[in-house]
Amino acid sequence: MMTLQQLLPNTTLPATAAGVVLSGLQLDSRKVMPGDAFLAVQGVASDGRQFVSQAIAAGAVAVLAEAETFSVQQEQAVPRVNFPGLSRSVGELAARWYGEPGSAMNVVGVTGTNGKTSITWFLRDALNALGHRCALVGTLGLGLKDNEQITGHTTPDPITLQAGLARVLEAGADTVAMEVSSHALDQHRLGPTPVSVAVFSNLSRDHLDYHGDMEAYLAAKSVLFTRDGVKLAVINCDDPVAYSLVGCLADGVRCVTFGDQTGATVRCASVAFTAEGTNAELNVGGESFSVTLPLFGRFNLSNLMAVAGILHGQGVSTDSLAGALAAITPVPGRMEPVQQAGCPTVIVDYAHTPDGLEKALQACRAHFAGRLFCIIGCGGDRDTGKRPQMAAVAERGADHVVFTSDNPRSEDPQKIIDEMCAGLTDTGSVQIIVERDRAVMDTVQAASDGDVILLAGKGHEDYQEVNGVRYPSDDRDLAHKAFNARGGAQ
């Protein structure tokens, strides 16, 4: 509980408003409970100021909005406060409400187009093996291991984030491995949460429907590395923008690099890819050791090196580091094999960018010897410019390609596929099966038991989103159903 004046210590309020006791903060008028303060933020998709009356009807006892027409008047039963820059300040307000929980933990923020989920997942496993209690914030949820709560976003809204940080702190977390999206950085979702370690995985085309161009996309990512409190930066030195990020670091920030370059702090001395995973020799700070893990793809080796860099940069010895990396487990829906005797191997992966798809296809080639099938679609109401690029990557990288649906949302699935086809050199080179379940079924039937099928785009997701409705659909379940229909051994 907190008064309105305590929430807004730098705002002059009438006594009747200042003493209003709040029981919670809410951004969504539909979720307002009696006693809450409603923060009517003007967002990208909707404007909270249009729902003030609904929030008050639901029991809101105060309303904050960026609106000059708002003023606190003595006679108002529900104080309405004009708060300039509210959208940029929600994180600060939420952190104040929850007691700034991030300040009591070591927060590691990971940004980049691809790899955020895997790096944070691997880091949590490794830190837990070292005796820490590390919480996860990202695509797969917010929480300690096996107690994640799905938030619906890579980086949740500021109130959900601070509430989650408070929850994991109370549960004993000492470290947080957080995915930090470009949207979150641009929208100030982290608020004042101190990030002590900033990590960069890579940069390739994505989210240009939001950022407009790659320069703005990079600028949003760069914000993570210029935040106050960053003590360690861990950067993929193989990416062309790496040294741009190094150049923006403040004096005194230690920089650890990982990649294939000779001068990298963390690099791979040798690697062998098998149908069971990856065997690699890593060199970390001049010392070498071997790791064998059930991980697929060179990009996962890069993710592994990022984690090694984070731990090395925080003083973990090589011996302890080797043991911690050995405890890493595969990420659900990230190069996840689904197998059944007598059937082709299906690899379920979240790849939904041209670069991510290309790397997933390359991984399948490296680990498996049979023909390579690729089932791919593109999400509706998202960056349309990458659709032909995704198609071109699939055509170039696979032996057989099937275009299908992938969360069409409000768009016509066939229209999305038609736009993908613009990137093909031969439109007759692909098969089009709009229904995703049928695409999986038919492809499993067509492939041989020594072949591999990359089922890309949805990964861990357990739904297909059509016109605002999320229908149950899990690619792993679709693969098992296709195996059973084919008659593979149980």
From Swiss-Prot:
Its EC number is 6.3.2.13. InterPro entries: Mur-like_cat_sf, Mur_ligase_C, Mur_ligase_C_dom_sf, Mur_ligase_cen, Mur_ligase_N, MurE/MurF_N, UDP-N-AcMur-Glu-dNH2Pim_ligase. GO terms for biological process: cell division; cell wall organization; peptidoglycan biosynthetic process; regulation of cell shape. Its main location: cytoplasm. Keywords: ATP-binding, Cell cycle, Cell division, Cell shape, Cell wall biogenesis/degradation, Cytoplasm, Ligase, Magnesium, Nucleotide-binding, Peptidoglycan synthesis. This is UDP-N-acetylmuramoyl-L-alanyl-D-glutamate--2,6-diaminopimelate ligase. Its cofactor is Mg(2+). Carboxylation is probably crucial for Mg(2+) binding and, consequently, for the gamma-phosphate positioning of ATP. ATP binds at G112, T113, N114, G115, K116, T117, S118. Signal peptide: none annotated. A motif (Meso-diaminopimelate recognition motif) lies at residues 406-409. Catalyzes the addition of meso-diaminopimelic acid to the nucleotide precursor UDP-N-acetylmuramoyl-L-alanyl-D-glutamate (UMAG) in the biosynthesis of bacterial cell-wall peptidoglycan. It is found in: Cytoplasm. It comes from Alcanivorax borkumensis (strain ATCC 700651 / DSM 11573 / NCIMB 13689 / SK2). Belongs to the MurCDEF family. MurE subfamily. Pfam families: Mur_ligase, Mur_ligase_C, Mur_ligase_M. UDP-N-acetyl-alpha-D-muramoyl-L-alanyl-D-glutamate binds at L27, S29, T154, T155, S181, Q187, R189. Meso-2,6-diaminopimelate binds at R382, D406, N407, P408, R409, G457, E461.
